[in-house]
C-alpha cells in the first residue's frame, strides 16, 4: 500500500469528509458541517465502542487482550469490477463487510471491528452516502461489529470501498491455510456454485425465479458461527471466494501436498442442481460450479477421525458441512467424477 499523509480515522479536521465534493459540483446551499455528518452518519456506526473515541481523534486505541492473537484482514472493491456500477449502495456496503467477515471466519477468529476507507466519485450526492451508511449500520447490528475509524476521499474514478477487519483468536489457535496432511479429508460448508450463478442471473444469463442465487451473490452469509467447531477440528482452511477448486489449491500449496476434489459430491442447492440438470455435459457443469467463486463458504482440511465430529459440531452451529475430497502426497489440485480422473479446464478467479 502506498504511504499516505492522511489521518487513519475519520475525524473533524479531515480535509476530505463523508460528503466531500469538488467545489465546482457543490450545491449553492451550504453543506452540513463536518460535525453534522460525522455525528449523523459515522458516529452511530461505532455503536458506542470506546476504542473508536467517538471518531474525535486521529487514531483508535485498541487494548491488548491477554491470551489472544489479533487477526487482521483487508478487502477492497471497485465499482465496475467487483460490483455493478449501478448496484444499490447499501448492498455494496453489506457485501464489503461480509466478505471481510468471511476471511475472519476462515481463520476461526471472533470479529471485533473494522476500519473503513471510501473513495467517492466526484459529485456523489448526500443520498448515496446515506444509503451506504445504512447498509453498514444494518450489518453492524446483525454481526455485532463496530466502525473503529477510517478515511474518505474524493476521486475522479469509480467508487472504491475498502475495509480492514480485526478479530480475536485464542493464542496459537488461528486456522491457517497451511496445516493439511496427506490423508486429511477436504470438507466444505453450505452449498457451492450459487454465488457464480447469482452473478449470471444479475447479467440475465440464467433463470433465478425466486431470486435465491442472486441473494447469495449480493449478500453472502459469512460462516462466523463455525469458528468454535473449526478450532477443535479443522487443521487448515480458506474461504471460497475465488472458487472451490482454486481455494482448495491454495490450502494444498501452503500445506505442501495435493488435494483431490470429488466433483460428484459437490453440495448443491436446488437452484444449482436445476441449472446443472440442464447442462449437456455434467463434468463441465460441475467444474463451472466449483470454479465460479463468490460462495464465501469455508473449505477446510479435517483429520479423517474427526470428520464425523466436525459435522456434528457444525450442525450444532447451524451449518451443514460435506466431505468432498482428500489430501494426498504431491502438489497442486486434481478432480475426479464417478471414479474417473478429470482435468479441470479452470480453477477459479486469478488476481492481477
Swiss-Prot record:
Residues bound to ATP: 150-151, 177, 241
Residues the record lists as binding Mg(2+) 1: 75, 151
Protein EC: 2.7.4.16
Enzyme class per UniProt: transferase
Pathways involved: Cofactor biosynthesis; thiamine diphosphate biosynthesis; thiamine diphosphate from thiamine phosphate: step 1/1
Gene3D superfamilies: PurM-like C-terminal domain, PurM-like, N-terminal domain
UniProt catalytic activity: thiamine phosphate + ATP = thiamine diphosphate + ADP
Function: Catalyzes the ATP-dependent phosphorylation of thiamine-monophosphate (TMP) to form thiamine-pyrophosphate (TPP), the active form of vitamin B1.
Protein's recorded name: Thiamine-monophosphate kinase
Organism of provenance: Caulobacter vibrioides (strain ATCC 19089 / CIP 103742 / CB 15)
Amino acid at each position: 500500500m502506498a504511504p499516505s499523509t492522511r489521518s487513519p480515522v475519520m475525524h473533524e479536521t479531515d480535509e476530505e469528509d463523508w460528503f466531500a465534493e469538488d467545489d465546482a459540483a457543490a450545491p449553492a446551499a451550504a453543506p452540513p458541517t463536518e460535525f453534522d455528518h460525522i455525528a449523523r452518519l459515522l458516529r452511530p456506526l461505532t455503536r458506542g465502542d470506546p476504542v473508536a473515541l467517538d471518531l474525535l481523534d486521529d487514531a483508535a486505541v485498541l487494548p491488548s487482550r491477554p491470551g489472544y492473537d489479533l487477526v487482521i484482514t483487508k478487502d477492497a472493491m471497485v465499482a465496475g469490477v467487483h460490483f455493478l456500477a449501478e448496484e444499490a449502495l447499501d448492498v455494496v456496503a453489506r457485501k464489503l463487510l461480509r466478505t471481510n467477515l468471511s476471511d475472519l471466519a476462515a481463520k476461526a477468529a471472533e470479529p471485533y471491528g473494522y476500519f473503513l476507507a471510501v473513495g467517492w466519485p466526484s459529485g456523489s450526492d448526500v443520498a448515496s452516502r446515506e444509503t451506504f451508511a445504512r447498509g453498514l449500520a444494518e450489518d453492524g447490528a446483525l454481526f455485532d461489529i463496530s466502525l473503529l475509524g477510517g478515511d474518505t476521499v474524493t476521486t475522479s474514478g469509480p467508487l472504491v470501498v475498502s475495509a480492514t477487519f480485526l478479530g480475536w483468536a485464542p493464542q496459537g489457535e488461528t486456522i491457517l491455510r497451511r496445516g493439511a496432511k496427506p490423508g486429511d479429508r477436504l470438507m466444505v460448508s453450505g452449498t457451492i456454485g450459487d454465488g457464480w450463478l447469482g452473478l449470471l442471473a444479475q447479467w440475465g444469463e440464467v433463470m433465478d425465479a425466486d431470486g435465491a442465487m442472486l441473494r447469495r451473490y449480493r449478500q453472502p452469509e459469512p460462516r462466523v458461527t463455525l469458528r468454535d467447531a473449526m478450532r477443535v477440528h479443522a487443521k487448515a482452511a480458506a474461504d471460497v471466494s475465488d472458487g472451490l477448486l482454486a481455494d482448495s489449491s491454495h490450502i494444498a500449496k501452503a500445506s505442501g501436498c495435493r488435494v483431490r476434489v470429488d466433483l460428484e459430491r459437490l453440495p448443491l442447492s436446488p437452484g444449482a442442481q436445476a441449472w446443472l440438470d440442464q447442462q449437456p455435459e455434467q463434468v463441465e457443469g460441475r467444474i463451472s460450479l466449483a470454479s465460479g467463486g463468490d460462495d464465501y463458504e469455508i473449505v477446510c482440511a479435517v483429520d479423517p477421525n474427526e470428520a464425523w465430529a466436525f459435522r456434528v459440531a457444525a450442525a450444532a452451529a447451524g451449518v451443514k458441512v460435506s466431505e468432498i475430497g482428500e489430501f494426498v502426497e504431491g502438489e497442486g489440485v486434481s478432480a475426479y467424477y464417478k471414479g474417473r480422473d478429470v482435468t479441470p479446464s479452470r480453477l477459479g478467479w486469478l488476481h492481477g
